[in-house]
Amino acid sequence: MSQLNPKVGFVSLGCPKALVDSERILTQLRVEGYDIVPSYDAADVVVVNTCGFIDSAVTESLDAIGEAMNANGKVIVTGCLGKRPEQIREAYPQVLAVSGPQDYQSVMEAVHAALPPRHDPFVDLVPDYGIKLTPRHYAYLKISEGCNHRCSFCIIPSMRGDLASRPVDEVLREAERLVRGGVKELLVVSQDTSAYGVDLKYAERPWRDRMYQTRMKALCEGLSELGVWTRLHYVYPYPHVDDVIPLMAEGKLLPYLDIPFQHASPRILKLMKRPGAVEKTLERVQRWKAMCPEITVRSTFIVGFPGETDAEFEALLEFLDQAQLDRVGAFAYSPVEGASANALPDPVPEELKQERLARFMARQAEISAARLEAKIGSVQQCLVDLIEDDIAVARSRADAPEIDGLVHIQNGGELKLKVGDLVDVEITDSDEHDLFGDALPSDPAAQPPRALNLQMV
C-alpha cells in the first residue's frame, strides 16, 4: 500500500445496528483509497461513531471523543449522539464535524474536507461484501432503520427516525455476498425486525427465480436458501412472530428468538407503551416451545421503572418462573434525555432499583443454570469463535455472539479445530452461563457437508 494514502482512525461504539453503520463507512473509505489504521498516532483524522441511548452510553461516547481529541486533535463525530450536536460541541468545540446516525454522506464529506482522497483503483481492492468489523465467519445483516413505536423509555425514533425497510431483494443479495465471502452465520438486526416491510406495504421483489414479499417470514425463507445459520434479533412481540416458528422447527432458521418483553405488569407495560397482555405472552412462549422444542428465547427487561411497586416486581419474578426463558438481560431504569418516561411520577429510589436488579438476575441465573444443565449428555452443533491453547471456544445454535453463553470444547486442540468450523459437541458439563464438552470426530462419509446454495450476482 502506498505510503501516500491518507490514514483514518476509527472508533465504533454502541449496538450491532451502529456497528453495521461503521462497516458501511469503513467500506466507503477503503473504496476511496483511505487506509484504516489502528492507532491515533498513525491517523491523519479520527472518526468516532457514537451511541446516545442511555446515560452511560453518552458518557462513554464523550469520553471516546475526548480521548481522540487529546491523542490526535482531528476528530469527526457521527452516530446517535450526533443528534445532539450542541452537547458534543459544548464539551469539545474543536471537533471537525458532527452528524447523526446513518448519515454516511455527511461523514464522507467531512473526511474529504479534512483529508482529500488519493484513490488508486489498481491497488485499493475491497471485497464485494465490504469491510467487516466482525470475525469473518459471522456478520450482522441490517434489514431496516428506525422504528414506528414510541416506547416511553426510548429515544431511538428521535435519533434514527421512523421505520425505513430495505427492499427484500437488496437484503438477500447482500446476504448472498456475505456467505460467498465466508460468513457462516447471519445475524438479522434492526430496531424492530417484526415490522420489517410494513412501510413498503410488503412489496414483492424478485430474487433468483421467484418473488418474495418484503416481510419477515418471506425474508427468512429466502435466507434459508443460503445454507448458513440465520439468527433473528430485536423481534417485537407481534402475533405474526408465530409464523416463523415452523421455519425453525424445519431447520431452515436457527431456533432462536431475541424478543424484548421489558416487564410483566400490565400497568407498567402500559406506562412503557408496550404490549400488555402478559397471559397471552406466556401462552405464546409455551406454544413456541411446543411447536419447536429446541427454541431458545432471549429477552430483556427493565427493573425499577417509575411507579413499579413491590407487588409488580414480584409479578416480574413470577413471570420468569413461568416463562422459563433461556437467556435474559436486564438493567435498572435510568432517565434518558428526551424520553417521555422522565415525566412519570413515583420514581423508584436508586438503592431499591439496584436491589431489585440483583434479585432479578439471581432468579434468572438459577433458571439459566437449570436449563443448561439439562443439556448435559446432548450433542450440540457449534460454531468455533476462538482458539485458546488446546481449547476451542464456540457457540451453540442457542448462543448469539457477545450477549449469550459459550461452549468450551476441551479437545479442540487435539482435533485441530479452526475458527469458523462447524462441529458437533457432546456436552459434559455446564454452569449458569456456559457449556463444556468434547467435539465428536467428523465422519465425512456419514455426514457430508451441506452445500451452500449460492448463485453469482
From Swiss-Prot:
Residues 133-370 form the Radical SAM core domain. [4Fe-4S] cluster 2 binds at C147, C151, C154. Its cofactor is [4Fe-4S] cluster. It comes from the Bacteria. Residues 373-441 form the TRAM domain. Residues 6-116 form the MTTase N-terminal domain. GO terms for molecular function: 4 iron, 4 sulfur cluster binding; aspartic acid methylthiotransferase activity; metal ion binding; protein methylthiotransferase activity. Its main location: cytoplasm. Its EC number is 2.8.4.4. Keywords: 4Fe-4S, Cytoplasm, Iron, Iron-sulfur, Metal-binding, S-adenosyl-L-methionine, Transferase. The keyword Calcium does not apply. Pfam families: Radical_SAM (PF04055), TRAM_2 (PF18693), UPF0004 (PF00919). It is found in: Cytoplasm. Binds 2 [4Fe-4S] clusters. One cluster is coordinated with 3 cysteines and an exchangeable S-adenosyl-L-methionine. GO terms for biological process: tRNA modification. CDD domains: Radical_SAM (cd01335). It catalyses: L-aspartate(89)-[ribosomal protein uS12]-hydrogen + (sulfur carrier)-SH + AH2 + 2 S-adenosyl-L-methionine = 3-methylsulfanyl-L-aspartate(89)-[ribosomal protein uS12]-hydrogen + (sulfur carrier)-H + 5'-deoxyadenosine + L-methionine + A + S-adenosyl-L-homocysteine + 2 H(+). Transmembrane segments: none annotated. One of its GO terms (cellular component) is cytosol. The keyword rRNA-binding does not apply. [4Fe-4S] cluster 1 binds at C15, C51, C80. Belongs to the methylthiotransferase family. RimO subfamily. Catalyzes the methylthiolation of an aspartic acid residue of ribosomal protein uS12. PANTHER family: RIBOSOMAL PROTEIN S12 METHYLTHIOTRANSFERASE RIMO (PTHR43837), RIBOSOMAL PROTEIN US12 METHYLTHIOTRANSFERASE RIMO (PTHR43837:SF1). This is Ribosomal protein uS12 methylthiotransferase RimO. It comes from Xanthomonas campestris pv. campestris (strain ATCC 33913 / DSM 3586 / NCPPB 528 / LMG 568 / P 25).
